Amino acid sequence: MHLNRRIALGLLVVLLQACASGPKPSQPDLNEAGGGSDWLLPNRDYAGQRYAGLNGITPDNAAGLRPVCTFNSADTSRFAGNPLVWRGKLYLTTRASTYALNAADCTMIWKHEAPGTLNAFQSRGAALKDGKLVRATMDGGLIALDAETGAPVWESRAADATRGEAMVMSPVAFEDMVIVAVGIGEYGVKGWIGAFRLADGAPVWKFTTIPVDGDPAATTWSSSETRARGGGGVWTVAPSIDIDQGLLFVAVGNPAPDFFGDVREGTNLYTASLVVLDVRTGQLRWHRQFVPHDLHDHDLTVSGPLYQVSIDGRRLSMVATGGKDGLLRALDRDSHQEVFSVAVTTRTNADAAPTTAGVHSCPGALGGLQWNSPAFSPRLNRLFVPAVDWCATFRKADQLRYVPGQFYMGGSATADPVEKSRGWLTALDAATGAVAWRYESRLPMVAAVTATSGDMLFTGELTGDFLALDARDGKVLYRHAVGGAIGNGVITYGVGGRQVVAVTSGTATAFWKVPAAPASVTLFALP
């Protein structure tokens, strides 16, 4: 009897050890992602704070940073992803390829090439959970790879690329699901965000950003035909999740056609809106529209970070949100009321409707807040907001024509010469919106920004310069040219006992007027 008990106890110990060492990262790992030394989610944690509790690099020693290594993919397609890091491996996605690298020395561990016919857009990243790395393909597929080997685990069809549906947003893993979305409303399709089963890619729920028949919001459109191709893409890096309340915060893009509003009279919900869903069911909890009847392609792009502040002795739960209209807003997540709104770029003639002759307006369609979210430092109580200062002339077409799978814009937005553009990195008081400092770049700032407990900020410029700044005053402490434009992820993590900064570069796109360069990642650390 005692022998049997010892055998049973031994088997129990083995089983417990097997569970503890099973596929990772697990849900508890992701829930605590903000406090670890890895980088497990597109914006580091579910709240989207892009804040790392790492202080090996500080304002006192940042000038001593040096490049450690560079991985060059030789892929010159558009590149705008945020890497993930888990236990010494760095995962990186380009338009068609997925890489696992050694997070200390850039050595490639494996590479996977996505099948299918890809369109001209890009991947913003992948989701990592339970031993699977899940990414979207530009022909509407979802692929799960074994995170250790790169071998395919499953594939599923999530979107219809023949209609113009393109999945750009980085997938986000939560519990037994992976959340993805359809962006690029300019093709005249209806945007959506949905969840698929992590185990096999089967659909779980879908929320359509253009209201369906029976939804009271359908009355904000002039006809069901217009709603059928109403836009509302979700295309920026990733939504935020309040894991305590089970809420998913989603930034929804512009209505379609972009510049020809005659065919879509009304406010056009849920476009240019912050939409808050039950993360487990996709049911709408609340929403707030910021650009009713948008006529300037002024997508809402930012749905985080989620953070807390004290105002007049009250503790408020906040969400930062904003978009291509150049305004950064903060809302009380409980009352849904706006606490502050701050212009982080030039705004002139911003509400003037396009005409056939043309109307000059700021920001242009390439201005304001783009695909990367602000960072939040709880230590300094500040938001750090990258933005684009670039105006355009908006023209309405003489007539409108819809062809499935082709651009459906109803006009144009001609950007000013790139020499007239610039970028801003603005530090704001997270409770009041008061500006603490601003850094000006001679080109648009679209790269990710990461804050640390060492009072550092890491980001990059389209000039190709990696920047390390003092988060307290915005002083540039270190600058290094990496050889390609930086419009992508800039993250920090711990490996081998030291803090490392990974800088992705190689943005190749006609929109941002930068030379083509291969998708690359360069690691920086102190000697």
Give the label of every model feature segment.
Residues 1-8:
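Bacterial N-terminal signal peptides that target proteins for export
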Residues 322-372, 376-407, 479-482, 492-498, ...:
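Beta-propeller fold recognition
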Residues 22-73, 107-116, 151-160, 202-211, ...:
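Aromatic (tryptophan-biased) beta-strands that constitute blades/sheets of beta-rich domains
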Residues 98-99, 142, 193, 274, ...:
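Structural signal for beta-propeller blades
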Residues 39-43, 76-96, 118-142, 166-190, ...:
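Repeat-blade elements of multi-bladed beta-propeller folds
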